[in-house]
Amino acid sequence: QEQVDTICEKAAMAVSKMRIPLAKMANEETGYGIVVDKITKNQYASEHIWNYMRTAKTCGIIEENPAAGTKRVASPKGVIAAIVPTTNPTSTTIYKILIALKTRNSIIVSPHPNAVNCTIEAARIMRNAAIEAGLPENVISWVSVPSLEISDVMMKKVDLIIATGGEAMVHAAYSSGTPALGVGPGNCNAIIDETADLRMAVESIIHSKTFDNGMICATEQHITVLNSVYK
């Protein structure tokens, strides 16, 4: 566990140090979002997510019940396919690699065709730092020339898919025959009722929708205001 956590921390801190150039690179390559907000997302995906999961035990016996005579032992799943979108390319790459490293899985990053360079650069930074900390060389890899055909073949050959993207991509992941975790287009509804602080609600929704120009799929897409509140 100690070796795994050391590798994760080195990778997380290395990519966090490059959060600014990665944010600029993502913005310039995709034409999406706001640089300063992408910096925040990169920092969150690296430092905050690592700090959240750093104490989790992912090696050996993780749970034991002497009364029942049972033990739960953590083991790697195998090879993970990480499908990365053009909207949040670097931050998505960062947290998916951290998940793979923490759980001792190999990962293949498949960039969106419009975000190849920034996605690969984020993965390269993390791979180099992880290798220096003791990770075998080919645990982190990527698709240099992505295509639908390559993604389709890859999703059928790996052990787990973590797909983030459009509806068609997520549907393809779920239909591949491989276990998949998918995050597709958001349809988040904000309901404002009598208990709401109206000023706070409005400010929160505006901030959410304008952060990185609304690139995050969890931003509000629809607002429902009860008749008792609407004026």
In which residue ranges do the predicted regions lie?
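Aldehyde/semialdehyde dehydrogenase
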Residues: D5-M13, I20, K24, S147-L160, ...
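Solvent-exposed alpha-helices and their adjacent loops that cap or buttress functional pockets
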Residues: T70-K77, A100-L101, E132-P136, D152-K156, ...
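Conserved small-residue-rich beta-alpha loop and adjacent elements
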Residues: R54-A129, A133, S176-T178, N187, ...
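A structured beta-alpha segment of the ubiquitous adenosine-cofactor-binding alpha/beta core
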Residues: C59-R72, I140-V158
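N-terminal Rossmann-like NAD(P)+-binding subdomain of aldehyde/semialdehyde dehydrogenases
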Residues: Q1-T70
